[in-house]
From Swiss-Prot:
Organism from which the protein derives: Arabidopsis thaliana
Listed name of the protein: Multiple C2 domain and transmembrane region protein 14
Gene name for this UniProt entry: MCTP14
Residue sites binding Ca(2+) 2 per the record: 296, 352, 355, 359
Gene Ontology MF, one: metal ion binding
PANTHER family: MULTIPLE C2 DOMAIN AND TRANSMEMBRANE REGION PROTEIN 14 (PTHR31425:SF43), PHOSPHORIBOSYLANTHRANILATE TRANSFERASE ISOFORM 1 (PTHR31425)
GO terms for cellular component: Golgi membrane; vesicle
Length: 1017
């Protein structure tokens, strides 16, 4: 954005719905107060209306265009105090600056009103539009030349008289302006409902402070402002008035409320944050340019840097301007001196027309590394200086360079030649990637008309009906509607109008594909009747289900002989109210809707320090003699992917890089993977290798304490066809910062996904297909970056193969179910022990507890919840304080899996194994499915016995049950309910002496009821 562009934010307050009554008479008199970047505007009051309609536009100036996305627009809906004595707060809405649309692309969005505190009674929603307009500033008016008479008079007057007259004119102008403003206020006073506690606007600055030499014309009258800013009282800006209490945290820059949240995402706080990692000292050398005594600019020149056995040179250039930065890791240096030399290359052509290059040294300058200055940001960069090159053959040459000791936090580090990552190799540099913005594209196929099927007379007699379907294609995605049939008479006359009313949902990524191709095809002859292309730029967008997209007619074009084949009636829209899932639902890291107008402001900040790895195993060989690992780390949270630099040929690499993400939901997962870089080198044919997975960990943010640093080493385990293998450990530091407890509580009580997922849900099978489609789109888009993020890396991070059958995963899920049911089994064993009087004192206490529950039933719920409170409070001390749970190898059953099961897990679709191996696996799967089949039959039989009891399938059993119900009704009518509960309880826990080992009467009766098992073939 150019600096000379003025930006205005337009907030159009349209209407509100279903507000909370506040005046005691079932109505409310609502008005809206809008705050943005220190500016406040107010709408008119709509008296006694729970569905007010304003349609007012409020304008705000954007002071800093670059940081507009970090500002917060807050709308507070209030009830007029004059109409009621109750609370005036009706709700609030906060919109992040990144959700503002440009002029022309704005849409009406209804935001649900949020509570100010937990105890607020708020309901309803407010509809508004927020967009910005860029304007060019008006040209500065040219200074008018004073008239000659006025100028001469001014020159003739003494300085004292001139100053006095100037001051008099300014005083009169100020009085005139104040009078006009006063008249204007008197006119506007009866129109507006001014608050008694409002302050007057600040007075204009004293014009006497500036005394121009020439006469000043009276200022023009002030321009009328449609929405004047509302002065704020000191009490209104307090945080307790807004229901938000700031929470003190460890870091000084994290103190504040959610109104101060944009300060967490400022660049100055992000750029200077390296408190989660260790400072790595680097020796920086900036080689700017060289100057020769003999002005010979024809020969290329380069500089050579030597530190012990480490040497590197700049690129060879004729202009002698390099401006290159070199960063040497201090721990790897084996010398205390730096030698910089400048060399000249000269090409000599021999008699046989061959060219040879000779190099000549122009001079050398040395530095003692113990005397190199240190620089720590935010210090300014060290200015390069001219140094004279010492040379006996070519004296008088100079080189401009700067040498300093810094850390990885230095601004020059990212673009510098780095000694630990192989220099200036693009594939080994740290990068940040962004996933493409994904949308759901909904195509509703309604019907077709005037189809020109073109069947001959012979075809009509052979084919009684014609089956049609509609195929839609967006890029590589192809979806088809169901088949529909039309009769031969309709097909012959061309009057067939088949109707579908079916939705086809695609995944579209920005920038969109140019066209959506819709084709009507005939199944009977396998030919296309006609097709049309819908331009994606003409597709409208909707954010909720309150507005339906407009239906449109498109002509179907056939081949050259039939330019018109009919027309098709469809609805097309981009669904902005959904979140497009591109990862598994249980490890999702982002749940925001596609439309940025619906996005909420971030609630916190996630900071991740990738420190290093230890004891990595070699994954490849170098020079055919020794193993090596070139490791780097990829972290994903939300649409942001980060990739650290690759540390070459080290088993204990240290990255010490820190990154930040905005957090919009605490119940999300951070995914971190370690890989071996195989792409920075090419083979003999020029093809890049593949990156090898080393391990992966996940950190769920909801398990982290806020504003606390977690520094742990996580085991890296990878599943190979030969079995599970421990590849090493990675050291990660994580901190989740959130300045407001209220934002966290609101996040826990709101739905996980946007509203459209619940009002118009997608089917499980359809959502699974769309998720894998989104994964493929993200993988393909990141693979086209430069340098690319490999397909194997993205697939491993997104878990694209989690739907594939795996015996290991099936066992892991089965053991999870068993672990959960084991707690219920423990309770059942405890109750059985009480029934059988294993511990008589406990059974006696249960008798007393049963009597207390029956006699005082109102104490049951308080006792249960108090017991739960005490249990959870006592377990607080045993929570995981230090270690954050990540991938659990034991829970994943990686140690108890057979080699054949692992080989089956790595087998693709279709299988590539031998038929004998496939037969064995199929027989094993049949055995497991047989057990599941028997279990399902037993469960179904229990439900069928209950249905048989009420359907008189066994007349005698149902008759017995009917007689029992009759006597039971008389018994329960006569016997008090408390007596029945005591009797039933005492009978259930009676002493074993009064028990029988045989099954009870109800169990015998239920097992004799018939089921449908005997009717299954």
């Amino acid at each position: 954005m150019a600096d000379n562009v003025l930006r205005k934010l337009i907030v159009e307050i349209c209407s509100a719905r279903n507000l909370m009554p506040k005046d005691g008479q079932g109505t409310a008199s609502a008005y809206a107060i809008v705050d943005f970047d220190g500016q406040r505007r107010r709408t008119k009051t709509k008296f006694r209306d729970l569905n007010p309609q304003w349609d007012e536009k409020l304008e705000f100036f954007v002071h800093d265009v670059a940081t507009m996305g970090e500002e917060i627009l807050e709308i507070n809906l209030c009830n007029d105090k004059k109409t009621g004595k109750r609370s005036t707060f009706l709700g609030k809405v906060k919109i992040a600056g990144s959700a503002f649309a440009s002029a022309g692309s704005e849409t009406l969005v209804y935001y649900p009103l949020e509570k100010r505190s937990v105890f607020s009674q708020i309901k309803g929603e407010i509809g508004l539009k927020a967009y910005y307009v860029d304007e060019n500033p008006p040209a500065a008016p040219a200074a008018t030349e004073p008239k000659p008479e006025a100028a001469a008079a001014t020159e003739e007057k003494p300085p004292e008289i001139a100053k006095a007259e100037d001051g008099k004119k300014e005083t009169e102008a100020a009085k005139t302006e104040e009078k006009k403003e006063g008249d204007k206020k008197e006119e506007e006073k009866p129109k507006e409902e001014a608050k008694p506690d409002e302050k007057k606007p600040d007075a204009p600055p004293d014009t006497k402070a500036k005394k121009p030499d020439t006469a000043v014309a009276p200022p023009p009258p002030p321009a009328e402002v449609k929405n004047p800013p509302i002065p704020q009282k000191a009490e209104t800006v307090k945080q307790n008035e807004l229901g938000i209490k700031p929470e003190n945290v460890n870091r000084q820059d994290l103190i504040g409320s959610d109104l101060e949240l944009p300060s967490l995402t400022r660049d100055q706080n992000r750029g200077g944050g390296y408190d989660l990692v260790d400072r790595m000292p680097f020796l920086y050398i900036r080689v700017a340019k060289a100057k020769r005594a003999k002005n010979d600019g024809s020969n290329p020149v380069y500089a050579k840097l030597v530190i012990g056995t480490n040497g590197v040179k700049t690129r060879s250039q004729t202009g002698k301007d390099w401006d290159q930065v070199f960063a040497f890791e201090k721990e790897s240096l084996n010398s205390t001196s730096l030698e910089v030399s400048v060399w000249s290359e000269e090409k000599i052509e021999k008699e046989d027309k061959t060219t040879t290059t000779t190099e000549s040294c122009l001079g050398t300058v040395s530095f003692d590394l113990q005397e190199v200055p240190k620089r720590v940001p935010p210090d300014s960069p060290l200015a390069p200086q001219w140094y004279t090159l010492e040379s006996e053959k070519s004296p008088g040459n100079d080189v401009m360079l700067a040498v300093w000791l810094g850390t990885q936090a230095d601004e020059a580090f990212q673009e510098a030649w780095q000694s630990d990552s192989g220099g200036l190799i693009p594939e080994t540099r740290s990068k940040v990637y962004l996933s493409p913005k994904l949308w759901y594209l909904r195509l509703t196929v309604i019907q077709t008309q005037d189809l020109q099927l073109g069947l001959g007379s012979e075809a009509k007699s052979k084919i009684p009906t014609t089956e049609l379907y509609v195929k839609a294609q967006l890029g590589p995605q192809v979806f088809k509607t169901a088949r529909t049939s039309i009769g031969p008479s309709a097909s012959s006359s061309g009057s067939g109008n088949p109707t579908w009313n079916e939705d086809l949902v695609f995944v579209a990524s920005e920038p969109f594909e140019p066209f959506l191709i819709v084709t009507v095809e005939d199944i009977t002859n396998g030919q296309s009747i006609g097709q049309t292309k819908i331009h994606m730029g003409s597709v409208e967008r909707r954010n909720d289900d309150r507005t339906e997209p407009k239906s449109r007619w498109f002509n179907l074009a056939g081949d050259e002989k039939k330019p018109y084949s009919g027309r098709i009636h469809v609805k097309v829209c981009l669904e902005g109210g959904y979140h497009v899932l591109d990862e598994a639902a249980h490890v999702t890291s982002d749940v925001r809707p596609s439309a940025k107008q619906l996005a909420k402001p971030p609630i916190g900040l996630l900071e991740v320090g990738i420190r290093g790895a230890t004891n990595l195993l070699p994954v490849k060989t170098r020079d055919g003699t020794r193993g090596t690992t070139d490791a780097y780390v990829v972290a994903k949270y939300g649409p942001k992917w980060i990739r650290t630099r690759t540390i070459l040929d080290r088993f204990n690499p240290r990255w010490n890089e820190q990154y930040t993400w905005d957090v919009y939901d605490p119940c999300t997962v951070l995914t971190i993977g370690v890989f071996d870089n195989g792409r920075y080198k090419r083979d003999e044919s020029g093809k890049q290798g593949r990156d090898v997975r080393v391990g992966k960990i996940r950190v769920r943010l909801s398990t982290l304490d806020m504003n606390r640093i977690y520094l742990n080493s996580y085991t890296l385990t990878v599943i190979l066809p030969s079995g599970a293998k421990k590849m090493g450990e990675v050291e990660i530091a994580v901190r989740f910062s959130c300045p407001s407890w209220l934002s966290i509580i609101q996040a826990y009580v709101t739905p996980m996904l946007p509203r459209m997922h619940y009002v118009r849900p997608l089917g499980p099978a359809q959502q699974d297909i769309l998720r894998h489609t989104a994964m493929r789109i993200v993988t393909a888009r990141l693979a086209r970056s430069e340098p690319p993020l490999g397909q194997e890396v993205v697939q491993y991070m997104l878990d694209t193969d989690n739907h594939v059958w795996s015996m290991r995963r099936s066992k892991a899920n089965w053991f999870r179910v068993i672990t959960f049911l084991s707690r219920a089994a423990t309770i059942a064993r405890w109750i059985h022990g009480i029934r059988t009087w294993v511990h008589p004192p406990t059974t006696v206490l249960v008798h007393l507890l049963l009597v207390a529950i029956v006699l005082c039933p109102h104490l049951v719920l308080p006792t249960v919840f108090m017991y739960a409170f005490l249990i959870l409070a006592l377990r607080f001390r045993y929570r995981g304080r230090v270690k954050v749970n990540s991938v659990d190898p034991r829970l994943s059953c990686v140690d108890s899996v057979a080699p054949d099961e692992l080989d089956e897990e790595f087998d693709g679709f279709p299988t590539t194994r031998q038929p004998e191996v496939v037969r064995i696996r199929y027989d094993r799967l049949r055995a497991l499915a047989g057990r599941a089949q028997t279990l399902l039959g037993d469960v179904a039989a229990q439900g069928e016995r209950v249905e048989a009891l009420f359907n008189w399938r066994d007349p005698r059993a149902t008759c017995i049950f009917v007689v029992f119900c009759l006597f039971a009704s008389f018994l329960f009518y006569i016997v008090p309910f408390k007596v029945f509960l005591l009797g039933s309880g005492f009978y259930y826990i009676r002493h074993p002496r009064f028990r029988d080992d045989m099954p009870s009467v109800p169990v015998n009766f239920f097992r004799r009821l018939p089921s449908m098992s005997d009717q299954i073939l």
